[in-house]
């Protein structure tokens, strides 16, 4: 059924996309809860070596807010979204492909003056959106990192150990 979504459908998905990105960057987990679908497809194989085909939203929020991942208070991020393409998969599902640049800096302490590690990722991400009770929600992500700057591989090293293929979390992982 792949076809172009309507303007209203795209703007609904853009709203969910903005809420997802900005809640990640501000670490506003209550806000994140409001913009996600009940179940998400999280494909973090590009940096955590893990795919969750059907992760419940509560588990997704716990993972995102974990101090070994984005919940680290010493980690600052900015999820920049560039141009996008949109494809309607079904009446209640849309797939977006978005250009992304995501700088990351982890500081040594709460003074936020000395950077311990920084790494910036550049590429695209396929993201899924679902209509839930007449509102478009963020329903998953698959980042494709084309290149990185600095020590990107070290930014989530602890998270990769915990959430990745050999980690102890993620019963829904593939």
UniProtKB/Swiss-Prot annotation:
Q: In which pathway does it act?
A: Secondary metabolite biosynthesis
* InterPro entries for this protein: NTF2-like_dom_sf, Scytalone_dehydratase, Scytalone_dh
> Which top-level enzyme class is recorded in the Swiss-Prot or TrEMBL entry?
lyase
> Which GO molecular function annotations are given, in alphabetical order?
scytalone dehydratase activity
Q: Please state the Enzyme Commission number of this protein.
A: 4.2.1.-
Which positions in this protein are listed as binding substrate?
24, 44, 47
Catalytic residues per the record? 79, 104
Tell me the GO BP annotations in alphabetical order: melanin metabolic process
What are the entry keywords?
Answer: Lyase
Q: Which is one Pfam family of this protein?
A: Scytalone_dh
Q: Subunit arrangement? A: Homotrimer. Each subunit contains an active site, located in the central part of the hydrophobic core of the monomer, which functions independently.
Function in brief: Dehydratase; part of the gene cluster that mediates the biosynthesis of agnestins, dihydroxy-xanthone metabolites. The pathway begins with the assembly and cyclization of atrochrysone thioester by the non-reducing polyketide synthase Agnpks1. The atrochrysone carboxyl ACP thioesterase AgnL7 then breaks the thioester bond and releases the atrochrysone carboxylic acid as the first enzyme-free intermediate.
Give the family from UniProt: Belongs to the scytalone dehydratase family.
Name the UniProt record assigns to this protein: Dehydratase AgnL8
- What organism does this protein naturally occur in? Paecilomyces divaricatus
């Amino acid at each position: 059924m792949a076809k172009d979504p309507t303007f209203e459908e795209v703007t609904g998905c853009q709203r969910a996309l903005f809420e997802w990105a900005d809640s990640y960057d501000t670490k506003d987990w209550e806000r994140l809860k409001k913009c996600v679908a009940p179940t998400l497809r999280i494909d973090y194989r590009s940096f955590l070596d893990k795919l969750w085909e059907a992760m419940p939203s509560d588990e997704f929020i716990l993972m995102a807010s974990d101090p070994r991942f984005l919940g680290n208070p010493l980690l600052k991020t900015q999820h920049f979204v560039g141009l996008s393409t949109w494809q309607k998969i079904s009446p209640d599902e849309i797939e977006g492909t978005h250009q992304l640049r995501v700088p990351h800096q982890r500081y040594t302490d709460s003074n936020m003056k000395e950077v311990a590690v920084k790494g910036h990722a550049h590429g695209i991400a396929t993201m899924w959106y679902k209509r839930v009770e007449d509102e478009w929600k963020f329903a998953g992500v698959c980042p494709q990192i084309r290149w990185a700057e600095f020590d990107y591989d070290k930014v989530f090293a602890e998270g990769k150990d915990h959430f990745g293929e050999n980690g102890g979390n993620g019963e829904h992982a593939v």
